[in-house]
Curated annotation (Swiss-Prot):
E.C. code: 3.1.11.6
Protein name: Exodeoxyribonuclease 7 small subunit
GO terms of molecular function: exodeoxyribonuclease VII activity
Organism: Sinorhizobium medicae (strain WSM419)
Family matches, as Pfam families: Exonuc_VII_S (PF02609)
Keywords noted in UniProt: Cytoplasm, Exonuclease, Hydrolase, Nuclease
Family: Belongs to the XseB family.
Predominant place of localization: cytoplasm
Record's subunit section: Heterooligomer composed of large and small subunits.
Cellular location(s): Cytoplasm
Length: 83
C-alpha cells in the first residue's frame, strides 16, 4: 500500500474505518473481486484494522476509574487497568 492510502486511513474516524473495513470484508467474502483487487483491498483492510486498534487503545488509555476512600468519597482517579 502506498503512503497516500496510509495517510487516508490515518485521517479516518474509528466509525469510518470500521464501516470501510466491513465493506472490504463483505467484498472479500462474496468472492466477486479480481485477485489483484482482492490483494489491494486486503492490504487496506489490514491498515484499517491497525488504525482501529490504535484508536481503541488511545481511548482505553484515557478512561479512568474513580478511586474512593473508606467512607465512599471520591479520592482521585487511577487508570482503569491498574490491577
Amino acid at each position: 500500500m502506498n503512503n497516500t492510502a496510509q495517510q487516508d486511513v490515518s485521517a479516518l474516524s474509528f466509525e469510518q474505518a470500521v464501516e470501510e473495513l466491513e465493506r472490504i470484508v463483505s467484498a472479500l467474502e462474496r468472492g466477486d473481486v479480481a485477485l489483484d483487487k482482492s490483494i489491494e483491498i486486503y492490504e487496506r483492510g489490514e491498515a484499517l484494522k491497525k488504525h482501529c486498534e490504535a484508536l481503541l487503545k488511545a481511548a482505553e488509555d484515557r478512561i479512568e476509574k474513580i478511586r474512593l476512600d473508606r467512607a465512599g468519597r471520591p479520592q482521585g482517579v487511577e487508570p482503569l487497568d491498574a490491577e
